[in-house]
Amino acid sequence: MSTFTPTRNDWQLDEILELFHTAFNDLILQSHLLHRQFFSNNEVQISSLLNIKTGGCPENCKYCSQSAHYKTDLKKESLLDIESIKKAIQTAKKNGADRFCFAAAWRQVRDRDLEYICDIIDLIKSENLESCASLGMVTLEQAKKLKNAGLDFYNHNIDTSRDFYPNVTTTRSYDDRLTSLNNIHEAGINICSGGILGLGESVEDRAKMLLTLANLKEHPLSVPINRLVPIKGTPFENNAKIDNIDFIKTIAVARILMPKSYIRLAAGRMSMSEEMQALCLFAGANSIFYGEKLLTTPNADCNDDRNLLSKLGAKTKEPVFFNS
């Protein structure tokens, strides 16, 4: 197509709610056609995620198995050694990932760990993969150091709407999250930020969450949309599963609001059929996580993902070197 839809940072809530209330077929057709204006047809970005520090997090996020506030079956582990991380990076590349993400169950980045983090970034770049870190809140000075080390992306999800947020987490504020996102942006690192569906939020909360992301100074380049995986021992262990159609519609609305962003099917794919995942990809999702585990929750098998992408005639994206 020769006519491109301009990106916007001035969305209004009533506009987004109107999209959510659009007939399903009309909505996903609109999002699909818009997706084709900005991305190669049938191309899917592949990320791999490794937990470098498991459990013992001081935050009280009610969905999380790694929170020290809840009694789950998770065993607390110390920082992974560099050699184990190197092997994980090489395995991810072998499996076809173009981005390697690493996460730690921390409230915030600690200055004493920056050298270790920068060593991980070096390992990722040495394998010609994009790098992404998810390490909690981050100051501007820390973000600048990570940028100088070659970090491509920093993940910091907002989880839900500002209104619903106190029902999810009380140990850090919504503004804390937005401050970190601003620090990441000011440091020149690409933002990865999204949310979780199935926390008990309303459609309006989903609209407000996407409104916050779409009206940032710059749209997040990656927007992970997670489906809650209920964890035994957490306050949300008995939450009802979000309706499949509602999930797909959220993907479609995210695509329309942020047409140049990679919309990622993140946690919860194990509960999705191939047909549902195919509809999500049609509606505008164009990124997935490869690997048997996402932090502490099971993920789709790599072979199953390859088979699905093959059935759909999809191809994987080549890495982009933002800090080469």
From Swiss-Prot:
It comes from the Bacteria. It holds the Pfam family Radical_SAM. Disulfide bonds: none annotated. Residues 42-269 form the Radical SAM core domain. Belongs to the radical SAM superfamily. Biotin synthase family. Its EC number is 2.8.1.6. [2Fe-2S] cluster binds at residues 101, 132, 192, 264. Keywords: 2Fe-2S, 4Fe-4S, Biotin biosynthesis, Iron, Iron-sulfur, Metal-binding, S-adenosyl-L-methionine, Transferase. Coiled coil: none annotated. One of its GO terms (molecular function) is biotin synthase activity. The lineage of its organism: Bacteria, Pseudomonadati, Pseudomonadota, Alphaproteobacteria, Rickettsiales. The gene is bioB. This is Biotin synthase. [4Fe-4S] cluster binds at residues 57, 61, 64. It comes from Ehrlichia canis (strain Jake). Homodimer. Binds 1 [4Fe-4S] cluster. The cluster is coordinated with 3 cysteines and an exchangeable S-adenosyl-L-methionine. Binds 1 [2Fe-2S] cluster. The cluster is coordinated with 3 cysteines and 1 arginine.
